[in-house]
């Protein structure tokens, strides 16, 4: 890992608070004073915790269990209980994600520029950048570094292009996402 990235990695993680009580956390607890004494340990701990959160979601989800059923016909059959489980899952996932920040990771996409751009604009709209200019600039800086750090190097050109267009979209008099997706 480059020295520059190691120094800037802390920008990818919000310092405004801890985990929401509804989010399951792993037993590893990281305190702020420990992060400065061991800067090379902090990134892997955060990333492992971040990844384990999504692993727990996908494995423990009733939707995941239903699709991994040995009975292929069971995948397509629906009944009232399955619909209730799906509603509960949707509610629990939306509760889980409502207090956090989701960053799009690259998957093989026919148009990664468009996907990253849409994701960034959704993040900016959810943040409502009308507060303090310095805080907004720091948030955008953090957003860019998170996308760059969490995605492979071959996607960085799409991320930087999408980020530049997101900045232009923010600075335009009447932001229209469709204009910047072409």
Curated annotation (Swiss-Prot):
Keyword Hydrolase: no
GO biological process, one term: negative regulation of DNA-templated transcription
Entry keyword annotation includes Repeat: no
Purpose: Transcriptional repressor that may regulate multiple aspects of plant growth and development through the regulation of BEL1-LIKE (BLH) and KNOX TALE (KNAT) homeodomain transcription factors.
InterPro entries: Ovate, Ovate_C
Tissue expression from the record: Expressed in roots, rosette and cauline leaves, shoots, stems, flower buds and siliques.
Region of interest (Disordered), ranges: 62-94
OVATE domain ranges (all copies): 104-169
GO CC annotation: nucleus
Organism: Arabidopsis thaliana (Mouse-ear cress)
Pfam families on file: Ovate
Primary location class: nucleus
Keywords from the named record: Nucleus, Repressor, Transcription, Transcription regulation
Protein name (database record): Transcription repressor OFP11
Misc. comment: Plants over-expressing OFP11 have no visible phenotype.
Compartments, record wording: Nucleus
Superkingdom in the source lineage: Eukaryota
């Amino acid at each position: 890992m480059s020295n520059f990235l190691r120094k800037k990695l802390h920008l990818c993680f919000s310092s405004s608070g801890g985990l929401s009580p509804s989010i399951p956390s792993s037993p590893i607890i990281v305190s702020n004073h420990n992060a400065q004494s061991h800067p090379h340990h902090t990134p892997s701990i955060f990333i492992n915790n971040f990844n384990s959160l999504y692993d727990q979601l996908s494995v423990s989800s009733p939707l995941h269990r239903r699709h991994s059923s040995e009975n292929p016909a069971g995948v397509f059959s629906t009944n009232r209980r399955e619909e209730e489980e799906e509603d509960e899952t949707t509610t629990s996932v939306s509760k889980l994600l409502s207090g956090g920040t989701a960053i799009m990771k690259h998957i093989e996409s026919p148009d990664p520029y468009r996907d990253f751009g849409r994701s960034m604009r959704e993040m900016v709209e959810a943040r409502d950048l009308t507060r303090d200019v310095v805080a907004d600039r720091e948030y955008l800086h953090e957003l860019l570094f998170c996308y760059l750090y969490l995605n492979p190097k071959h996607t960085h050109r799409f991320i930087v292009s999408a980020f530049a267009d997101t900045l232009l979209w923010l600075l335009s008099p009447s932001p229209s996402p469709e204009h910047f997706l072409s």
